Amino acid sequence: MILKSFLLGNLVSLCMKIINSVVVVGLYYGFLTTFSIGPSYLFLLRARVMEEGEEGTEKKVSATTGFITGQLMMFISIYYAPLHLALGRPHTITVLALPYLLFHFFWNNHKNFFDYGSTTRNSMRNLSIQCVFLNNLIFQLFNHFILPSSMLARLVNIYMFRCNNKMLFVTSSFVGWLIGHILFMKWVGLVLVWIRQNHSIRSNKYIRSNKYLVSELINSMARIFSILLFITCVYYLGRIPSPIITKKLKETPTTEERGESEEETDVEIETPTTEERGESEEETDVEIETPTTEERGESEEETDVEIETPTTEERGESEEETDVEIETASETKGAKQEQEGSTEEDPSPSLFSEEKEDPDKIDETEEIRVNGKEKTKDEFHFTETSYNNSPVYKVSYLYKNQENFNKIKILDKKDEDKGLFWFEKPLVTLLFDYKRWNRPLRYIKNNRFERTARNEMSQYFFYTCRSDGKERISFTYPPSLSTFGEMIQRRMSLPTLEKLSSDELYNHWIYTNKQKKNNLNNEFLNRIKALDMGFLSLDILEKSTRLYNDTKKDYLPKIYDPILNGSYRGTIKKKFSPSIRNKISLENFIETMEINKIHNLLLPDTDYQEFKQKIDPFDKKKRFSTEISHLFTLISKFDRESRSGLNLKGPSLFSENEAKLLKFLLNAIITIANGHKIKQKSFGIKEISKKVPRWSDKFITELEQQTGVIQEGVRVGHQIRSRKIDDIVVFTDNKWNSKNRDKIDLIYTIEYLQESDFRRNIIKGSMRTQRRKTIIWKLFEANAHSPLFLNRRKKSPLFSFDISELMKLIFRNWMGKGAELKDYTEEQTKRREKQEENNIKEKVRIELPEIWDLVPFSKTTRSLLLIIQSMLRKYIILPSLIIVKNIGRILLFQPPEWSEDFHEWKREKHIKCTYNGVQLSETELPANWLTEGIQIKILFPFCLKPWYRSKPKLRPSYRDLKKEQKKDDSCFLTASGMETDLPFGSPRKRTSFFEPIFKDFLALRVLIRRTKHFLQGSKETKRGFIKNVLFLFLKRIKKELSKVNPTLFRLKEVYESGETNQEKGSIISNQTIHNSFNKIRSTDNYSPREKKIKNLTDRTSPIRKKIKSITKEKKKGTPGIKSSPNKRSYNVESPKDIWQILKRRNTRLIWKLQVFLKIFIEKIYIDIFLYIINIARMYTRLVLESTKKIIQKYKYIYNNETNQETINKTNQNTIHFISTIKKSLYNIRNSKKNSHLFFDLSSLSQAYVFYKLSRTRVINLYKLRSVLEYHGTSFFLKTAIKDSFGTQGIFHSELEHTKFPSYGTNQWKNWLRGHYQYNLSQIRWSGLIPQKWRNTINQGRITQKKNLTKWDSKDRLLHYKKQNAFEVYSLPNPNKNENSQKYYRYDLLSYKSINYERKTDPYIIYGSPLQVNNNQRISYNYTTQKQKFFDILEDIPINNYLGKGDIMYMEKNPDRKYFDWKIINFFLREKVDIETWIKMDPNSNKNTKIESKNYQKIDKIHKNQIFYLTLYQDLEKNPLNQKKHLFGWMEMNQEILNRHISNLELWFFPEFVLLYNVYKKKPWIIPSKLLLLNLNRNENVSDNKNINGKQKWNFFRPSNEKKIFELKNRNQEEKEPADRGDLGSDAQNQGNRRFVLSNQQKDIEEDYAKLVLKRGKTKKQSKNKSNVKVELNALLKQHLLFQLRYDEGLKQRMINNLKVSCLLIGLKNPRNITVSSIQNREISLDIMLIRKSLTVRELMKRGVLIIEPIRLSVKKDGQFIMYQTIGISLIHKSKYQTNQRYREQRYIDKKKFDESTPRYQRRTGNRDKNHYDFLVPEKILSSRRRRELRILIHFNSRSRKGVDSNPVFCNKKNIKSRSPFLDESKRFDRDKNELIKLKFFLGPNYRLEDLACINRYWFDTNNGSNFSMLRIYPQLKIR
């Protein structure tokens, strides 16, 4: 057995080795290449088929030999790089294939072309045989075309990179190809033989009848092959980048508005007069003097060089008449153009800036003859650098314009020097200009930038790089970097580091890391020691070195500072207004053009020397060229005005000699041979950077052109091909106008044609043949996709391979215990079926016009049919029906109804519509209706009725009106004469003429049957029936008489009711006696009917008893409550009455319903009564408690206005209390509904675990004390709490246990298990975990109890306790004043849990999950004004919170704030004062008066303001009121938005529901404080400039007022210190606000200036339009992510309005149709009020525009938690500062300190810019150095103990000895220190599975591929 397995294993391994061997892979690859059939196969087959005889055999041999030789060369090219470059480039196809194919095409058609006669002496001298050989050889080198060769080429590249024995691979692949080729040729030969010998083919009738067909076929074989060759030729013609077929777009010299990223040309033509330059043009590098004066437009395309006539010409719109454009072929990939000054205006030049010409300009002189006069024009310099070490090319490609210039002559000096190869460069650039649109590239427009970046191919490039000290293969290595490295290696001798072995390299890496770590550690310790010695902390802090500008006496801006990197180089946008730019002299704008010295290394020496000789007179002084090149490349681009005066603060950057040299270079004037002067004003050094190429053209689509996109008043041609569209004329204004007689105004809409879109926005002239693999399997494929997206498309049943539904059906019982399938009620199933049916109908309706479009002339036929049907219906069919009906009535002796019928017939109108249903008019047909098709809409369709009502009702009832509304007043006519509701819809049923007649007959028939049944029945039934009829008849008479004489009949009714009661009582007593006697009777005597009644009574009696007992309990349980918890009334009739009603019914019905009744009553008992009892009890208790607390609060505040010490005790905010009530009620009410939000999280990743750990207090029983001593009514047993001890792993602990626990393995695991399901909020979990997964987990876990829904497990019990108890924030006893100064400065929850035993009676304050008692901060009111250095952490739980800083990559002061409680003030102070807004300043007096406006209810909402609190209005009930959409983002959820306010939740406090619910659901996304203010900032800017100390900044502003709203409810004594706090210590924030406003004002000025310029040119735009545009631009500029959208419902209603308006415009008397349209809601009147001149603000007010939220944080929930995890070491101030005015006044230089603020602090905290809480010593170092230190500690930890050996955090003794400042307060107990250690050094010491966090955070990278395999597991142990 062992032997067998051994042999089997060896066999498998042997097979694997063989399969993976190089030979087998090569054979496989070679066999694959057999199927890559190229054009050479045509020649090979031609030789096989056509040639016969001796010469034919020789040709076959030569063809095969050439074929194999060519393939061998292809395989050799795989191994031999130069051959591969030659054959693998498109040059080969262009140079070889096209001429050769064309030559063969002509040769085969002219047989005598090469016919020299046959020479049989030596067959090899025969030219035709040699040609056959050459054909097969050369054509084999061409690219294959039947199977794409790219796949095989990639296979080769990958395998060549992998395998070692490359030559063996090449040889084996050739052998494989040879085998495949031989097999293929043998198969072809067999097929030919079979065709010749097959009798069935010969005996074919067609072949026999055409005797000469076979001979003709053989004779025309040459022609067939020549046709095939021609097709191949055309195919290749399409694939090459040829300039002949593809269209080169003319680059338009339009003066574009470009925003902030505009660029300028490098060549500036200096004139005797000062040039007027455009707004944002930069200085140029070379000034060339010319005698002409030129005014230039705003921005000139770099690749356009316009040569102007001698006359002065303003460059404007129509320049093309006077310009000749010399279009340059741009650089290929190697030459990347540098940006000059765009970084100053655009922080990301690689994305948003245009291409510039290369700085390496080569002179070129053009001599231009204009109208016979010779004139020397400007010199232009262009370079063309090839990809890899090719010579430098120049461009001399001209675009000739014969209209303006007779002769253009270009004298090219350099070309003359080059000699024979002068043609080389123009030819290559002509054929291979990569900037031409001859590739199917998309032009993807950005919303902000019109020009677009080119879509380059993705760079998958294999190269070796070092990672973690080892050589690794990187597949995303930038190829430009590798070629750059190769160039450098050829030019310079680099250190021979690569010769070292990998182990030596790794050791070297470890050594350098250790050195770095030691240096950092030493520096760190030195700084801490200096702190211990008492130095100022700001001197100890590490500050980054900054570049200093001596001339300006200021630091260089961070964005330009080369020393700073990473996040410091943020985005700064500098803008200059046009007036300032015009004033600044051109001398400051001019930059010189100087060669980047690094090109000395890259370019070939000859060219470089030639260049130096041409432009550099200092050529002989080569001694400094290389030195300066090294020096200059170190320096980045500096500020343009002070390039010569840059110094580091400290030692000088340049030595004296270098400084002289610089000065000499900077002020040099270079003279060129032709006498022009080039002034070098300054020296600009350029960084080597890769630049994303950007198209210089601004393209528009076909659609934009047709819709009238105008560029500076000139309608330009489109360059992007859109989907085919048709213009449908809606309305033609034919009114004759004396001024414009020829002008006819057309109003038209655009319609897409029903055909596949193969254009797909491709640029004109781009190649089509390369767009392969588009599949079509429908009649109409709107978007042709490749099969790659097949799985994302809606599959047809034939192609759907999804068996998941089948698997669910089969294995649904295996899906886990308790999984339940949803029970659909009958109504739901019906609704679903109806929905499916409607979907099918809609699909058919859409596909029908597609079928019509496919059939030729179908639209014409259908249009004619419709018109015929319309005429027939209107004038023949309907009148004839009317005549027949009325004749029939006359014959039946009925009065005829001619007038009524013809009146209805006249009402019917046939409206001609467009093909899509846009109504035009009754008489006018749309233009081109025969070709494009029409629809005919019938208004008020005539329906023939047998009779009309004789007397119409005076007042129609509501039901009748509803019926009339439901009745459709319009339909469309089909080609078959039927009616349909929608165009191409299914025909609808017509109301039958005979239906009402049959109804009457049916009623008669039923009456006859009933009477017959009545007559045949028994006497008893007759009597009962007569009695009932008489009783009802008498009752009706009595009612009528009681109206006449009410008093008499009321007395009678009272008397009768008494009698009936007596009768009832007697009946019941008789019944009971009868029942008791019945028990004695024998059962045999019963009739079947009596048995049924007895059984029924026996079953129902216990049910009745139960119902009675329940109602009694209910009455006892809720004595004082009359209303139910939710606003529905449970008016259930008493069971007695129900029984009486049922008893009166027929016994058959009772018998059927007995089971149902039982189930129904049990349901009522379970679902309603117990629920009501429990809810009612809870609410009564809570209401009583709340009223008690509110009364206490009012009393206390009234009595203690000036008593400062007792404020703490009274500081219970009712909103906190209410929120706790609401939270508990919400949990109880929604625990069943939201139970899917809490679940078992066994698969949670470590990041979430550590997030939880960072928020958890010490694991001791202090916190459980509050659970045990919870003062509310407990719904739990003590045993459950004891059980929970075991789950936390602390069952063995005792209450007095205060020692900090050691975290071994067991404690770690137990700790993770017992953390309350990682207490994140419900909202957070719902965002993190997919909904379906949650549902499946929870289906089996929900357990119910009658009084409480208890969820999941014992841990959830603790979670509930935690929700009720741990949101209770405790304060110390206010009598102990000496402790209050300390305790308020750290975390209240931590303090409570740690020091619980030492405090006897902590005061409970109820806290909201969203808020914290910021008023507790009052006790910062120190007796002595001693400034504390550090604030201890206030670690408020952030369950439902995301702050501004939590959003990744946000700047410190964005225009949007993300939920700071400061922002809510704009909302609450204006509308509602819920909290006591108390503010105490540290510097204020103790006896400061505090005025608080408490518990003011919701004020009346002012209708003149934008903000409306209509969030909870039901959309269906309020369809016309669109105001609720304005702030719909508050809820973020449409379902919540649609919920009505009459929800069960929180109905006791309706005054708080609106405010609380808005912020409770998803509070982290709130619009900017300036959002609404900026909508009307034209009015506000001037007002907001002067914010003095007394004014408050309000975030909210009424729309019709022009002053800033001042805050109320503050007295003056409080206001002054508050103002100091607001505008003094917070001066920076205020400054930022002013800065924002001033910037916005500048933006508006710029926008207006641009508009004025435009208006001066076009003179057509109206003022209103410009105002709207300015407002919109201002709004879009502020909100970087575009958030404006319009309401979808509004869009549909506007379309409906348009359709009806089109009809009404064409009607002479539109009144009737207008009224009916309004009644049918086809016209929305509220939309018609929207004027064209409405501003953005008004549109938002009306609900037309909606502000969308930025959902960054919601999408990045997981990332947010990761960042929270990593930022544990960070101590930040409370994010929940509700009191906006409070600021602690600090005396530390903010500017200097901000420099050392790490990036992630902006994510997680420090939003007040008070970064002074340095409890963690690591913050001494800068962020980058801190990261370095941490990661080095990890990488170099050989032993696990080394991880924890950071000297600062070893143990308490070390902390005391080394760093006493940590323990500055001796009152800190040991537990507190241990807690600080845990929380603030958890960062670098925890286990982290999700190392993407480390990757993003520590290394400033976003690419996680390098770290995917890395895992760090330090031991979590603090000794």
UniProtKB/Swiss-Prot annotation:
Keywords: Chloroplast, Membrane, Plastid, Plastid inner membrane, Protein transport, Transmembrane, Transmembrane helix, Transport
Biased composition (Basic residues): 1107-1117
Ranges annotated as biased composition (Polar residues): 1626-1636
Renumbered residue ranges of the record's region Disordered: 250-375, 1107-1129, 1606-1636
Regions of compositional bias (Basic and acidic residues) in chain numbering: 1606-1623
Amino acid composition bias (Acidic residues), ranges on this chain: 259-269, 278-288, 297-307, 316-328, 355-366
TM spans (from-to): 18-38, 67-87, 90-110, 127-147, 175-195, 224-244
Its membrane topology: Multi-pass membrane protein
Annotated localization: Plastid, Chloroplast inner membrane
Keyword Protein transport in record: yes
Superkingdom, taxonomy of origin: Eukaryota
UniProt GO cellular component terms: chloroplast inner membrane
GO biological process: protein transport
Subunit record text: Part of the Tic complex.
Family: Belongs to the TIC214 family.
Main function: Involved in protein precursor import into chloroplasts. May be part of an intermediate translocation complex acting as a protein-conducting channel at the inner envelope.
Protein name: Protein TIC 214
Species of provenance: Panax ginseng (Korean ginseng)
Organism taxonomic ancestry: Eukaryota, Viridiplantae, Streptophyta, Embryophyta, Tracheophyta
